[in-house]
Regions:
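Loop/helix-junction capping segments adjacent to catalytic residues or to phosphate/diphosphate-binding pockets
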Residues: 22-25, 49, 80-81
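A generic local structural motif
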Residues: 1-4, 56-58
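Thioredoxin-like thiol-disulfide oxidoreductase module
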Residues: 44-65, 72, 92-93
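Non-catalytic, surface beta->alpha helical segment in thiol-disulfide oxidoreductase systems
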Residues: 73-93
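Surface-exposed charge patches
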Residues: 30, 34, 57, 69
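Local sequence-structure signature of Cys/Sec-based thiol-disulfide redox active-site neighborhoods
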Residues: 2-38
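Conserved strand-to-helix beginnings and helix N-cap segments that scaffold or border functional pockets
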Residues: 26-29, 52-53, 84
């Protein structure tokens, strides 16, 4: 399974679980890029079945509903959905 990388200023380990067709996921990626943040993302819907199942299980540890986008910051904080203010606050600290 391949994580895609968007280079920027390192604000910790940031991982975004997304769908390639999800408007809110696209908005989250755009916000992170506008903020100049270094992050990794996985478009779960583009994965092969076996990888998709692994990633969905991994994601559900953070977000049991399995909804998108799911943003994990430093393996400590989880933000579900496009929560612009919450994302900005978490990454400015």
């Amino acid at each position: 399974m391949e994580k895609k990388h968007s280079e920027g200023v390192k604000k910790g380990e940031i991982l975004l679980y997304a769908l390639s067709t999800c408007v809110w996921c696209q908005k989250t990626k755009k916000l992170l890029k506008e903020m100049g943040v270094d992050f990794y993302y996985i478009d779960v819907d583009l994965l092969e079945d076996e990888d998709k199942k692994k990633v969905e299980e991994e994601m559900k540890r953070w977000n049991p509903r399995g909804s998108f986008p799911t943003l994990i910051i430093n393996n400590q904080k989880c933000i579900v959905g496009f929560q612009e203010d919450e994302i900005r606050k978490a990454l400015i600290e």
